[in-house]
Amino acid sequence: KITHFLGIVDVYKQLIHYEKPKLFKVEPKYGKDYMEPDAFTIWRRSPFFIEVQKSVYSKKIMQDKINRYELYFHSQEWHNESWQPKGSKFFPSILIITDKQYDINSSNLRIFQASSISKFMDSLAVKA
């Protein structure tokens, strides 16, 4: 469990290299049927659920994880989060920090996979 928390700390340190998160919660709880992200952050004016995957999981386990996010999405409980802007509601993107690319999908969620925050930033950079 210690190496897992060190992984979360490492991601935080990578985030502040670019910009200090407005909010960074470690292992926030959303209810037993819903997802259990390693962190929730508001970073660069966008909300993210962060999963730090140092272990390799099966496609089924990863899809089950995503399905829990889907359940939370459909519950609309996220509309009531204190960080939500007054006028419009945003469901956070999911950022999976992993060395393995998983074949997972969702029609409702924005899912990013990268081995580090810098690789994630590279993937967002406009290709000239």
Explain the meaning of each model-derived region:
Residues 26-29, 97-99, 114:
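Conserved beta-strand termini and adjacent loop/short-helix elements that scaffold enzyme active sites
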